[in-house]
Amino acid sequence: MVLNSASKSAWNSTSGRSGAVVLLSGGMDSCVCAVLAARDDRAAAVHVSYGQRTEARERRSFESICDRLGIRDRLLVRNEALQAIGGSALTDASIAVPEVGAIGTGAPGAVPVGVPVTYVPFRNAHFLAVAVSWAEVLGAEKVYIGAVEPDSSGYPDCRPEYYRAFNEVVKAGTKEGAIRVVTPLIAMHKHEIVTLGLELGAPFDLTWSCYQCEERACGVCDSCVLRLRAFHEAGAEDPIPYAAAAARLR
């Protein structure tokens, strides 16, 4: 664990702004959340590494986004339990990351229906536990997470009812019960998130979404295809590099 943070007293001395902790993976959804948090509150950012395939690249995106947004208070956490538990293509090298066909090619290329093998079992609960714990120490009132239900991969921990239930846990399990987990993007389609991010000046060029590559995004995993489709539907150019084979998707 690496902590670069002001003390609670220094945090609370900031004039007139409430505090928020944002979970920042380095992807485009969490980046837009970080922009919203930094705009509306004094923001601190948490990044959790859990043995995922693109761990180093995601951490680099986290640091770069924080630098661009001026977020100084950062917490880097390594969760070894999720990798040890396995059960996901993101954490288990023996499970292949599925490749999705090109945009607009019909059913064979569609994003899979149901919970895919890239789902990391109960991952967001681990992330939220860290963020809420830190928010309680800092005296922050909100925890931002970039969960999205429409146009997502069908992950069960990205549903509104999950966050309603989690907020009840936070209310019952923290000293003052005043921390709220907020999900400003949860009802938005991916292309709407791209449009919002562009309006807010979100640094999409610093983000990373690919599940399996760290130098050039593969363009064919579930996450890449959802991202490419979102930029296409928003009428915008995705600023990150893709492998040559993925150029046909753009």
Segments and roles (model prediction):
Residues 2-4, 11-201:
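ATP-dependent adenylation/nucleotidyltransferase module used to activate substrates
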Residues 99, 202, 229-233:
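A polyampholytic, Gly/Pro-enriched intrinsically disordered region
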Residues 174, 232-235:
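Short amphipathic alpha-helical interaction/hinge segments
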Residues 184, 215, 239-242:
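Residue-level signal for alpha-helical context at structural boundaries
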Residues 234-250:
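Short microdomains enriched in Cys/His and/or Lys/Arg
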Residues 39-40, 62-64, 214, 232, ...:
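Alpha-helix termini
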Residues 197-199, 204-213:
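Short, intrinsically disordered, charge-biased short linear motifs at domain edges
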Residues 129, 208-229:
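Local cysteine-cluster metal-coordination motifs and their immediate loop/turn environment
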